[in-house]
Amino acid sequence: MTVLIHVLGSDIPHHNRTVLRFFNDALAATSEHAREFMVVGKDDGLSDSCPALSVQFFPGKKSLAEAVIAKAKANRQQRFFFHGQFNPTLWLALLSGGIKPSQFFWHIWGADLYELSSGLRYKLFYPLRRLAQKRVGCVFATRGDLSFFAKTHPKVRGELLYFPTRMDPSLNTMANDRQREGKMTILVGNSGDRSNDHIAALRAVHQQFGDTVKVVVPMGYPPNNEAYIEEVRQAGLELFSEENLQILSEKLEFDAYLALLRQCDLGYFIFARQQGIGTLCLLIQAGIPCVLNRENPFWQDMTEQHLPVLFTTDDLNEDIVREAQRQLASVDKNTIAFFSPNYLQGWQRALAIAAGEVA
């Protein structure tokens, strides 16, 4: 049987590193279909830190796409697992027959599914991408994204799968000893990416709570984002006093980020699509409820796991937030499907499906 090849077709260092390390640590030892990777980006020590994997690096999307297409044409039994599919050339290859549906398995990351960019180039490309998506052999995604995808592509097979968020399961039962009274601290957004719509989110928080809460905005990723960070800072200072606005412009190490999240009382995410599962998982693990946009279908996954969900359209106050905290504290976090290690079973099944080992 031909070994499955995994494709990380865009240079997204943070997510690519997470996927590679997860496969190296959790999957490669037990499955030959979890070892072969083609990745856009620099090695930057990844080969050394992932010795169980065979990783081929490419300088850009186009060179990787050309190599994938060549392999697909040379052997029609060769199957590919695309982790987040932001590479236009690969979509066009699927549409034109360069890659066959039986070769194309896609794990939806969120941004690769929704059509939210307003640029002309994107507007022209979206219809072609939609046509190509009808030809995918199988999609893997969150419950909410599967539901969203099925509305336009009901005939494409869909399977539940969660991004392998880096988590320490031993923290599931750790009581959050933060004092749950007094001034609340609200986390706004999951990164410095513009998709978080930080300024609108800050205005929404201010409309709900005024200048009575402390707002923390993590913006250390992506790099070279100083102009936008300053734009958000100035908008924030028009709404909140300096002592109530904390904008983090430096990238935090994982443990420091975890400590930051545990100082919060609420997460506030205004984006109208599924994103930031990693941050949501870490907040939920710490007993911190989240406010989501109703257009973000991840609320379906949360309610399926009996987790409280607040919405940006709700009338929020401290009593409602404290009640959500109490509800979250009563949930057995060891049973949550999108937590580590529970998502591992979904990955083992996904590998078997993509490799053709199970129907």
Curated annotation (Swiss-Prot):
InterPro entries on file: WecF (IPR009993)
Protein role: Catalyzes the synthesis of Und-PP-GlcNAc-ManNAcA-Fuc4NAc (Lipid III), the third lipid-linked intermediate involved in ECA synthesis.
UniProt key word Cell membrane: yes
GO biological process: enterobacterial common antigen biosynthetic process; fucosylation
High-level lineage: Bacteria, Pseudomonadati, Pseudomonadota, Gammaproteobacteria, Enterobacterales
Entry keyword set: Cell inner membrane, Cell membrane, Glycosyltransferase, Membrane, Transferase
Gene Ontology terms for molecular function: 4-acetamido-4,6-dideoxy-D-galactose transferase activity; fucosyltransferase activity
Full protein name: TDP-N-acetylfucosamine:lipid II N-acetylfucosaminyltransferase
Cellular localization per UniProt: Cell inner membrane
Family: Belongs to the glycosyltransferase 56 family.
